[in-house]
Each structure stands twice: as structure tokens, then as C-alpha cells.
């Protein structure tokens, strides 16, 4: 039995994680849950999973949550915490073996660091933690004897493929050191909602268009990131930190079927790939169960049913966010944190219909350019948090100026 903590239990990753726990009750027990504001769903999760502790980030909802839980008439009610301190306490909860980080965006950084500092194994679905704070996270993992296991499909695929390398059983794939025998990583991308749209039509994109993914069922923010290909650009940075691979050896390839989740190329020119239906539950389960594999009743992959797998190079003009991510990664230091925060704010403003779809990379680019003179190549955690806040304010202020920018 593995005891798990789920950070962001009411979100997409969190709900799927708890579905797995319900499907495998003899393998997993959720002992700690956290959420942002959704006390209705959190109450239902408490009823089903009976955790030892729960936390709600919005402190104004603590009493309402307590009332909801009291009305459940449980034999043993969980401890109820609130605010950021409560979330951090849940992240470091003593009984948990593994912490699944499903909090969206850079908001998940501090709780993830709390879990690492408590020596927990991390099933990382919050890629922003590594993107913004990779230089801090990697040493902290080593210091606290903690292991980071990717719970997103692409990095889980790479992680699984890497186990085909020599001496993989002795390797620690969360050290930022490139595994022996690895030559290159090929990250597959669906191409997002607009993969078949002509570039000239992107000026007409609506929020509804951008939040409709052809293959995956995800939250709105990450679906927009998929449409801009920023999601894949961020995954390039994450792969760099996770697997110690240089940016020159991490490539993006459009794969519309989303069946091959990523590939690795080895020194002898062999290529290994991991295949599966586009379902986030599989990488989440593997991050939770590793080094074991647990039996499921999920639909088996049928290649004859699929018929064909196709690939093409991404269009740099159509996906400018991809180039911005590579550039920020190569700049290193605090630049990836600025990129990530600027993107989060730009996407937020797009979802509120304050800017157009094609303006998203424009405002990200402006933030990165403005930060260049203050780039810190050896940041501490406080520096990361400071530039994260600066980038959000910068983008919001630029948008408020009301200027009309052309897309880059």
C-alpha cells in the first residue's frame, strides 16, 4: 500500500489521480488532499477517500468546509487547514510516501518544494516547478534523498524509454545528469487545436476555439498552451532539467494522433518510443506505482484500429512560443521563470478576452526582452518568486496600456 498526497485534488490531474486510487484500493490510499476553492468537490472527495488532512487555499472557505465535513458524519473527520501554510503542511504530511502535484502554474512551486524538503517522492504533473526553479529543485532533490517521477505523458514516456538504457536500474533520472547512452530526445506534440488551420486564420481565433483540444481532455490553460505550442516549449525546458539533455538535443515533432508520447534516440542510432492512448491516467499511474506496473482494465492499444501514425516538423511561424521557450531555456537562470509567468498572465488575459490569441507570444516576448538586463544566472528561491511576480505585473501593465501589438 502506498500512501499518497494529492495537491490540487479538485483539478484535472487531481480528480484523475483519485479515480486511480478508487480503482486500485489495495494499492493506494489518499491520506492528504488540497484544493483552491472548490469545497463542494473537496467535500465529496473527503467522503469517498477519508483522508487524514485536507487544506483549502482560500482561507475564507475554511469554516464552510468544516461545516460540510461535519455534515458527513464520518467516524473520524480529517484535520482541516487553510491558506498557503495549510497547503504546505499537506504537501509535507508525514504519513504520505508520494506527493502528486496537480496544482496548475507556478502556484505549485512552494508546495512542491515543501514536499521535497520533507523527503517525499514527487509525481510531478506541475511542470512549472522545474521550468521556473530547475536550478533550485534538482539540488534539493539530492539533498533530501527525494525522487522526482514525471506524471505528464511526454516525460513519462521518456522516463519509461530510458529504462532500456544500460544500468538503468542504478540510475537516478531526476539529477539533471544526462544518462549514459542517450543521444537525443524527441518530444511529440499533437499540434493543438489549430494544427490544420492556415496561419492567416489565427487572427480570428476565439476562446472557445483555443480551449477545444482534438485529442486530450485537459484544463483551459494547458489547452491554450497546446494551441500555441508553449506547452511543448515548456516541456523542452523540463526535459533539459529532468534528463540533463542539452537544448540542441531536444527536438519537437508534430504527431497528430498522439499515440507515440515521446521517443529517445540512443548513441547507436536506435530509437525507443512509448505508445498508448491519449489518456493522462496512464502516466499518472506509472508515476504512482513505479518501479512496479499495476494491472488495469483500461482499453488496450490497437494499432490496426489506428491505421497510421504520421509526423511533421512544427511551423516556427505558426508557433512562435516554441522559439521563445528554447531561447529562454538557453538563457537559463531566471529567464524560464519569466517566460512561464508571462505566459500564464498572457493566457489568463486571453481567456478573459482582453487580448487576442496572436498577442499571447507578443507579450511574452516583451517580458523576456525587458528582463534580459536583470537576468540572474544563479538564483535563489526568493529570486524566482520575485521575477515571477514582476513578469505577471509587467504583462498586465503592458496590456492595460491598451496598445495594439502585432504578433511576432
UniProtKB/Swiss-Prot annotation:
BP-aspect Gene Ontology terms: isopentenyl diphosphate biosynthetic process, methylerythritol 4-phosphate pathway involved in terpenoid biosynthetic process
Pfam families: DXP_redisom_C (PF08436), DXP_reductoisom (PF02670), DXPR_C (PF13288)
This protein's record includes keyword Transferase: no
This protein's UniProt keywords: Isoprene biosynthesis, Manganese, Metal-binding, NADP, Oxidoreductase
Enzyme Commission identifier(s): 1.1.1.267
Biochemical pathway: Isoprenoid biosynthesis; isopentenyl diphosphate biosynthesis via DXP pathway; isopentenyl diphosphate from 1-deoxy-D-xylulose 5-phosphate: step 1/6
GO MF entries: 1-deoxy-D-xylulose-5-phosphate reductoisomerase activity; manganese ion binding; NADPH binding
InterPro entries: DXP_reductoisomerase, DXP_reductoisomerase_C, DXP_reductoisomerase_N, DXPR_C, DXPR_C_sf, NAD(P)-bd_dom_sf
Residues annotated as binding Mn(2+): 152, 154, 235
Co-factor requirement: Mg(2+); Mn(2+)
Binding site for 1-deoxy-D-xylulose 5-phosphate: 127, 153-154, 190, 213, 226, 231-232, 235
Catalytic activity reported: 2-C-methyl-D-erythritol 4-phosphate + NADP(+) = 1-deoxy-D-xylulose 5-phosphate + NADPH + H(+)
Residues annotated for NADPH binding in this entry: 10-13, 36-38, 126, 128, 219
PANTHER family membership: 1-DEOXY-D-XYLULOSE 5-PHOSPHATE REDUCTOISOMERASE, 1-DEOXY-D-XYLULOSE 5-PHOSPHATE REDUCTOISOMERASE, CHLOROPLASTIC
Record-linked NCBIfam families: Dxr, PRK12464.1
Protein purpose: Catalyzes the NADPH-dependent rearrangement and reduction of 1-deoxy-D-xylulose-5-phosphate (DXP) to 2-C-methyl-D-erythritol 4-phosphate (MEP).
Family listed: Belongs to the DXR family.
Protein name in UniProt: 1-deoxy-D-xylulose 5-phosphate reductoisomerase
Gene behind the chain: dxr
Amino acid at each position: 500500500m502506498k500512501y499518497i498526497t494529492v495537491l490540487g485534488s479538485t483539478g484535472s490531474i487531481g480528480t484523475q489521480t483519485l479515480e486511480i486510487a478508487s480503482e486500485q484500493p489495495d494499492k493506494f490510499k489518499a491520506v492528504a488532499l488540497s484544493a483552491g476553492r472548490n469545497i463542494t468537490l473537496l467535500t465529496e472527495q473527503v467522503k469517498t477517500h477519508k483522508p487524514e488532512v485536507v487544506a483549502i487555499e482560500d482561507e475564507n472557505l475554511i469554516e464552510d468546509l468544516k461545516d460540510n465535513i461535519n455534515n458527513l458524519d464520518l467516524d473520524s473527520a480529517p484535520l482541516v487547514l487553510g491558506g498557503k501554510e495549510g497547503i504546505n503542511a499537506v504537501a509535507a504530511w508525514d504519513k504520505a510516501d508520494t506527493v502528486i502535484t496537480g496544482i496548475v502554474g507556478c502556484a505549485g512551486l512552494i508546495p512542491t518544494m515543501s514536499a521535497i524538503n520533507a523527503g517525499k517522492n514527487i509525481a510531478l504533473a506541475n511542470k512549472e516547478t522545474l521550468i521556473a526553479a530547475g536550478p533550485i529543485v534538482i539540488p534539493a532533490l539530492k539533498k533530501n534523498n527525494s525522487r522526482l517521477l514525471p506524471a505528464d505523458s511526454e516525460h513519462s514516456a521518456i522516463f519509461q524509454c530510458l529504462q532500456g538504457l544500460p544500468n538503468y536500474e542504478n540510475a537516478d533520472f531526476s539529477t539533471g545528469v544526462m544518462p549514459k547512452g542517450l543521444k537525443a530526445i524527441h518530444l511529440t506534440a499533437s499540434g493543438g487545436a489549430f494544427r490544420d488551420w492556415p496561419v492567416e486564420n489565427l487572427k480570428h481565433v476565439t476562446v472557445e476555439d483555443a480551449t477545444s483540444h482534438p485529442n486530450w481532455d485537459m484544463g483551459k490553460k494547458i489547452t491554450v498552451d497546446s494551441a500555441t505550442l508553449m506547452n511543448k516549449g515548456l516541456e523542452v525546458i523540463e526535459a533539459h532539467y529532468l534528463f540533463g539533455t542539452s537544448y540542441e538535443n531536444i527536438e519537437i515533432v508534430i504527431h497528430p494522433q498522439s499515440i507515440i508520447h515521446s521517443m529517445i534516440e540512443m548513441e547507436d542510432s536506435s530509437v525507443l518510443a512509448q505508445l498508448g492512448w491519449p489518456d493522462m491516467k496512464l502516466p499518472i499511474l506509472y508515476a504512482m506505482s513505479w518501479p512496479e506496473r499495476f494491472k488495469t482494465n483500461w482499453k488496450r492499444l490497437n494499432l490496426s484500429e489506428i491505421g497510421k501514425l504520421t509526423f511533421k516538423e512544427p511551423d516556427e511561424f505558426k508557433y512562435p512560443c516554441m522559439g521563445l521557450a528554447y531561447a529562454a531555456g538557453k538563457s537559463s537562470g531566471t529567464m524560464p521563470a519569466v517566460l512561464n509567468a508571462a505566459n500564464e498572465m498572457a493566457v489568463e488575459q486571453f481567456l478573459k478576452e482582453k487580448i487576442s490569441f496572436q498577442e499571447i507570444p507578443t507579450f511574452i516576448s516583451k517580458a523576456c526582452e525587458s528582463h534580459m538586463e536583470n537576468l540572474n544566472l544563479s538564483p535563489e528561491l526568493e529570486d524566482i518568486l520575485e521575477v515571477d511576480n514582476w513578469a505577471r505585473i509587467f504583462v498586465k501593465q503592458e496590456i492595460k496600456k491598451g496598445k495594439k501589438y502585432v504578433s511576432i
